[in-house]
Amino acid sequence: MVDFRKFYKENANVAYTVLGYPNLQISEAFLQRLDQSPIDILELGVAYSDPIADGEIIADAAKIALDQGVDIHSVFELLARIKTKKALVFMVYYNLIFSYGLEKFVKKAKSLGICALIVPELSFEESDDLVKECEKYNIALITLVSVTTPKERVKKLVKHAKGFIYLLASIGITGTKSVEEAILQDKVKEIRSFTNLPIFVGFGIQNNQDVKRMRKVADGVIVGTSIVKYFKQENLDIIMKDIEEIFKK
């Protein structure tokens, strides 16, 4: 199983993008320049028609991608053309994986250099079949923990976790306001008592000030909605500058 610590030094810069937004050409050009960016780990969002965990901005981006005919096949074709030293993670809804075929999907993802899967609506209790395939192909199925997750459930969730722990820093959908820093610090301390895996904080991280605050709390910071907003500009040079700005030290 991949050790995500090898992709960053002090703290991980984790970004999220919707593949095919605003179009596949810009997605591909962005991925071609990924190694020149401050991003250490990139979450690749696969557009889905019912994105229950996503806020309006990401849901709208997914709809634009879908309206252009972007699907799992075009995503795979795009990734087959990409070579990068950075860690790539799929953020994908379970129905897409199930429809494609669990083993077939995981095997294909592995062949394209995907290190891990984030499946937001898949509960721990329903994950056995996918866990089995991920273990077979040495891909991490990322564990999500919320600040409101009870301690005993945290212990249960992280016991067999792989890759990293995704700590949801806000309650609800992506792009919403982050909870108080002290609450997050307590949750990180609690998680650390059960696992040595790196802990990355996401949901509600909106600007460089948020990034700097969260770096003091966890091992990495995940920026999603703000980065998806940048892509609306459809100018890759400006997008890259904005990404540099939000992740600056």
From Swiss-Prot:
Reactions that this protein is recorded to catalyse: (1S,2R)-1-C-(indol-3-yl)glycerol 3-phosphate + L-serine = D-glyceraldehyde 3-phosphate + L-tryptophan + H2O
EC code: 4.2.1.20
Acetylation found in the keyword field: no
UniProt keyword Amino-acid biosynthesis, yes or no: yes
Top-level taxon: Bacteria
Role this protein plays: The alpha subunit is responsible for the aldol cleavage of indoleglycerol phosphate to indole and glyceraldehyde 3-phosphate.
Pathway noted in the entry: Amino-acid biosynthesis; L-tryptophan biosynthesis; L-tryptophan from chorismate: step 5/5
UniProtKB keywords: Amino-acid biosynthesis, Aromatic amino acid biosynthesis, Lyase, Tryptophan biosynthesis
PROSITE patterns noted in UniProt: TRP_SYNTHASE_ALPHA
Family: Belongs to the TrpA family.
Gene: trpA
Disulfide bonds: none
Quaternary data: Tetramer of two alpha and two beta chains.
Main EC class the enzyme belongs to: lyase
GO cellular component terms, semicolon-separated: cytosol
Active-site residues, record numbering mapped to chain: E43, D54
Protein name (Swiss-Prot/TrEMBL): Tryptophan synthase alpha chain
InterPro entries membership: Aldolase_TIM, RibuloseP-bd_barrel, Trp_synthase_alpha_AS, Trp_synthase_suA
Stored CDD domains: Tryptophan_synthase_alpha (cd04724)
MF (Gene Ontology): tryptophan synthase activity
